[in-house]
A protein has these predicted regions:
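Short, hydrophobic/π-rich interface segment
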Residues: 44-80
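C-terminal edge-of-domain segments
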Residues: 78-94
Length: 94
């Protein structure tokens, strides 16, 4: 198991806090707000945020989440079931 350095742990916690506080304001259709979400730090350098059971997502919502994250990141959307998708944000921790 890799020990996550304190600055990266703090940055990941700050991102998680910003998302939990701000997602309701930028997601009026509740496509992400209230959905199951997981946070995972990979190799101590990358934060992966995965939203499951999302009925769909618009580009404006993705951009809003990226603004909340406040760090360089990218997003992927992948089919989960016939009706839902997985929305994954990958953030570089510095």
């Amino acid at each position: 198991m890799i020990e996550v350095p304190a600055p990266q742990r703090a940055q990941a916690a700050a991102i998680q806090h910003r998302l939990s506080e701000g997602l309701g304001r930028i997601d009026p259709h509740h496509r992400l707000f209230g959905r199951p979400v997981s946070y995972r730090i990979i190799d101590g350098t990358t934060l992966e945020i995965t939203y499951r059971d999302v009925p769909g997502i618009a580009e404006a919502e993705v951009l809003g989440v990226k603004r909340l994250i406040g760090a360089e990141c990218f997003c992927t959307v992948a089919p989960q079931t016939a009706e839902t998708v997985l929305v994954r944000f990958v953030v570089s921790l510095k």
